[in-house]
Amino acid sequence: MDPITTASTEFCLDVFKELSSNNVGENIFFSPLTTFYALSMLLLGTRGKSAEQMEKVLHYDSFSGVLKAKTKNSSECSQVGVMHPDFRALISHINQQNSLSVANRIYGTRSISFHKQYVRCCEKLYQAKLQTVDFELSTEETRKSINAWVKNKTNGKITNLFAKGTIDPSSVMVLVSAIYFKGQWQNKFQKRETVKAPFHMGVGKSAVVNMMYQTGTFKLAIIKEPEMQVLELPYANNKLRMIILLPVGTASVSQIEKHLNVKMLREWTNPSNMVEREVDVHIPKFSLSVKYDLNTLLKSLGMRDIFNVANADLSGMSPDKGLYLSKVVHKSYVDVNEEGTEAAAATGESISVKRLPVTVQFTANCPFLFFIWDESGNILFAGKFASP
C-alpha cells in the first residue's frame, strides 16, 4: 500500500470511529476518498500551525519529509500537490469503467482576494475551481446555487445539501464534498430470490428486510478474533469490490470496530487470506442517505485552528486576513440492490484457513461494516448497516 493510500485509510478509520461513537446504533455511510481529497485541496493554501494540524489529521506528517525532499526545488504549488496526481489518475481510471462523479468545491466570499497560484493549483492538481460567491448579500441564492451544483454532480441523488438557514451570511468559506457511484455486481442477485427476512439489531430489537440471495464462488476469510466472516463481492470490471465484515457467533459489530485499524484491516482482507469458496450469500437490500457536518468531528481529531478566525492561517490561499473555514459538509447516498451498488459516499494467527464446509453460509442478518475500494486499496466508501 503506497503512502497516499495508507494516509487516506488512516484518515478513513479515524473518521469512521468518530462517526460511530457519535451515532451509536445508527447507520454510517461516507466517502473518505472525497473528504480526504477536498481537505487536501484546502491544505494547499494552509500554512503554519494550521497546516501542521491538518497534516497530522490527514496523516501526511508521517511521510512529509519525503515529499519536502521531492519538492525542494519546486515553487509551483505546495508539497501536497505532489501527492495527488495519483488521485486524479485514480478517479479518471474509475470513471472510465463505472459511473462515478466526485463533487469537491471551495466556495469563498467575494470580499476576499485569492492568490492566482492557489487557484491555478486547485485546477491543475484537483480539477476543481474555486467559486467566489456573496454570502452576505445573497445568502439564499448562494445556498441554492451550491445545492444545484451538487445535485448535478451526483446525478440528482444528493439534493438540498444545505437546508434553508444553514449557511450563515457571515460565512467566508465553505468546503463541500459529495460523491455518486453506480456499479454492477460481477455476479448479480436474482430478484426472484429476494425474500422477507428478519434483521437482528441487538437488545431484542429486530426488523424485516428484503434479503437478497445467491450461491457462487466468492473470496472469504474466517477471522477468529473478533469472530467474523470477511466476504468480497466484486463489481463487473473486477477493479472495484465491496468488502463486508460480518460478526458471527457471539461477536458484535462493536467488537469489530474496537479492533479496527489499518494494520488489522490489511490483515483481515489480505488476498492471501481470502480463500475462494462456494458461498451461500444472504445480504439485505438497502439504501442510505446520510449527511454530516464535519466541523466538530475534525476539531476533535485535532484540526482546530482552521475553523477559528483568529488562528486560521490560509496565507497560501489569500493575502487577506480573517479567512477561515466556516463549514465542512459531507453527504452520501448508497443503494445496494440485486443489480449492484448505487452510491452518491492482528496477528497472522487471527486468520483461519482451516477446513470449511463445502458451502459456507454468509448471512448478513445483523449489523455489519462494509467498504467499497479499488484494486490499490483506496477506500471510496465506508459504512455500517445497523438499522433498516
From Swiss-Prot:
Keywords: Cytoplasm, Protease inhibitor, Serine protease inhibitor. It comes from Mus musculus (Mouse). Expressed in eye, lung, lymphocytes, thymus, stomach, uterus, heart, brain, liver, skeletal muscle, and in day 7, 15, and 17 embryos. This is Serpin B11. Gene3D superfamilies: Alpha-1-antitrypsin, domain 1, Antithrombin, subunit I, domain 2. Residues 338-362 are annotated as: RCL. The keyword Cytoplasm applies. Its main location: cytoplasm. Inhibitor of serine proteases. Has moderate inhibitory activity for trypsin-like peptidases, but also some activity with cysteine peptidases, cathepsin L, K, and V, and the serine peptidase, tryptase gamma. It is found in: Cytoplasm. The record marks 354-355 as: Reactive bond. InterPro entries: Serpin_dom, Serpin_fam, Serpin_sf, Serpin_sf_1, Serpin_sf_2. GO terms for molecular function: serine-type endopeptidase inhibitor activity. Pfam families: Serpin.
